[in-house]
Amino acid sequence: MLFRSWLAHGRTNSILHNGFGVDEERRLLTEITAAITEATGRRPLGWMGPGLTETHHTPELLADLGYRYVLDWTNDDQPYPLTVPGMLSVPYSVELNDLLLFGKGFTGPEFVQIVIDQYEQLSADAANGSGRVLALALHPFVIGQAFRHKYFDQVLAYLAERPDAWLTTSDDIAAHYRSA
């Protein structure tokens, strides 16, 4: 089965979203949302600011545009509501970001072990029935390199074999949290 959802991540990753005035940010977010909706046929429900940046107004502006969650807050392994009505924070992890790990010289086998270690701890933490999110931040130009492919396959195989793992999308995580 193919899992996919479209997440807004800015116009480019080099235009950070800090320092915008409210009107300028609203215009930019509206343009980005329209472009994604036109290209995919589906309005995005989630947002991740370029470089995890936002202004004090970003969550409210996103809610006004129909977004339901952000991934800019890396402070928890579980979703939680923001102070803006209807908005959630869905977990994201900079620690499991392929760009950062491989950029710091980690090897393929080390990447596999890091993901396994993360899974094992989160699984233990979730033993009380309260799920945890293992977010893998992957970039095709990094993990997609031919010499890294077998390590990515190992990670996916390991996670797919875990009986308590739910391989899903951030849209589905947000929907599940809201339904609980």
Which residues does each PLM region occupy?
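Short, small-residue-biased leader/transition segments that mark boundaries at the very start
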Residues: M1-L2
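Hydrophobic faces of well-ordered beta-strands that scaffold small-molecule active sites
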Residues: W6-H9, L45-W47, Y69-L71, L88-V90, ...
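Glycine-rich phosphate-binding "P-loop"
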Residues: G10-L29
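Active-site-proximal loop/turn and secondary-structure-junction residues that shape catalytic pockets
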Residues: G10-S14, G51-T53, N75, V94-L96, ...
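Short, solvent-exposed loop/turn segments at secondary-structure boundaries
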Residues: N18-D23, F102-G103, Q145-H149
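Aromatic/hydrophobic pocket-lining residues that form the small-molecule binding cavity
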Residues: E25, L29, V112-V115, F152
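Active-site-adjacent pocket scaffolds in enzyme catalytic domains
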Residues: A34-E38, R42-G129
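C-terminal domain-boundary segment and adjacent tail
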Residues: Y69, I116-A180
